[in-house]
Amino acid sequence: MGSAADLKYSKEVERAAYEVGRLIAEEDGILFFGAEKDSDSLSTAACRGAKDAGGLTVGITYGKGKDIWEKDADIIIPCGLERGGGRETVLVTGCDAVIAISGGSGTLTELAIAYQADIPMVALAGYGGWADKLADEYLDTRNRILTIGAASPEEAVKKAFAAAAEYRRRYA
């Protein structure tokens, strides 16, 4: 989960997203990402990292049709829904854990959906956006799930895999 290109993120944060994708693939994880139709994003950078490491990628896109920005995704699922909650719900509920990097309103929506669905969230801090604001915080006073903070792509992936394993034990 991460910023779309219109938020003008830095090359540094793009490299971090790429690294997260690469590390997920190296751990034999499947990368689900928000497949954009009209621009690059941190999610597509993660897709490129996963693909370069030989991983499996699943792009969830809005609307109809499979024409997306990142042409190398293995599986593209057009959910028939639009941005702003519908596509994000399909994307997040397909995951055993989510990793947020930077992020604007779309990332915040995805984190709120994960929180409500009891899906573990890891926030890679140090790159701004909602990930920085929510690292090691709860989304509200109910304190359902702590957003797990991480300081590096390696730590984020390690923590996400550990949290995902616990999630699968609880909900298998």
Predicted regions and their residues:
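Short, hydrophobic alpha-helical segments
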Residues: 160-171
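C-terminal binding/interaction regions
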Residues: 2, 9, 80, 85-156
